Amino acid sequence: MPNTKSAEKHQRKSQRKRIFNLRAKKELKEQIKQLKDLIEAKKKQEALAFFPKIQSLLDRLVKRKKLVANNANRKKRRLLEKIEKITGDGIS
C-alpha cells in the first residue's frame, strides 16, 4: 500500500502503462505470428502486403519508447529476409 497520495497516483499511472505495454507486446507477437504463418504457407503477395503493417507497428513502439530501436530494426530485417527467401528476389 502506498503511504501518500502521490505514491497512489504513481501506482495508478504505472498500472495503466503496464496494461498498455502488455497490449502492445501482445499485438506485436500476434502480427508477427500471422506473418510467419503466411510465409510458411508460401503466400508471397499476402506476406508482402502484411509486412508494412508490422513495420509501422514496430516504428510506433520505438517512437513511444516501448521498444529499443535496434531490437525493432533486427525484427524487421529478419522478417524481411524470410519474405525474400520465399519470393526469391531482393526487396530491401
Swiss-Prot record:
GO terms for molecular function: rRNA binding; structural constituent of ribosome. NCBIfam families: S20 (TIGR00029). GO terms for biological process: translation. The gene is rpsT. The keyword S-adenosyl-L-methionine does not apply. It comes from Methylacidiphilum infernorum (isolate V4). Binds directly to 16S ribosomal RNA. This is Small ribosomal subunit protein bS20. Keywords: Ribonucleoprotein, Ribosomal protein, RNA-binding, rRNA-binding. It comes from the Bacteria. InterPro entries: Ribosomal_bS20, Ribosomal_bS20_sf. Belongs to the bacterial ribosomal protein bS20 family.
